[in-house]
Structure formats: C-alpha cells, structure tokens
Amino acid sequence: MNLIFKKKSYNFKLSTKVKNSKTTYLTKSGWIIKLTSNDKKIGFGEVSPLLEEDLKQCAKQLNMIPEYVRVFNLSEQINIFHPCIQSAINSALAEINGKIIFKKTITLMKLIKQPYF
C-alpha cells in the first residue's frame, strides 16, 4: 500500500504551567502527522516529545520521511525513528486499518483544515 505523508507543526502556550520532578512546561510543541492511503483512508498521529533535544531530533527525522512512501518501507524502517514518531506512525496506521477509531475534535479539525495540511 502506498501512503501520502504530511506533517504540520504546532506550538502553543499552555493555559497553566505543568511541572514534573525536573522541569516546568509553559508551552507544548510538536507535529500532527497525517497518512493517507491509496483508497483515501486517513490516519493521524501526534509527535510531541517533552525534551528540547528530542524535539530537535524529531524535526530532523520527520524531514527524512518522504511525502510518498510505501507502508512496507515505513514499517520496516520505523525502528530507526524516535519513540514519539514510532507511536504517531503506529497510531495513524492503526486508524487507517480500522483498528482504532478516534472521534474528531473541533480543535484537531481546525488544525487539519489549514491550507498546508
């Protein structure tokens, strides 16, 4: 199966700060990925690493994925990617294959309807 791969970055300020034992987070950054199959089935995934160095690594790795990709190639090479990217790809593929069904939220749909996506 051939897939079309698209990504859209986001960055927004959190309404309240989020703390863990090491860091306080004021913003959320990442990407929404969209995979579209030959038969126009669509799957989405979110890439949202917490650490700045992981965010940079994910940016580089997402740019390695071509716009047109075979599902076999993606499945074979998924292990080279950061775990956040692996999770996003697996989520998108599962949605395409009907293994998971997400309710589309207004916020996500607004993001997706942007001209680039």
Q: Model-predicted segments: where are they?
A:
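N-terminal capping/lid subdomain adjacent to the active-site entrance of alpha/beta enzymes
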Residues: 1-117
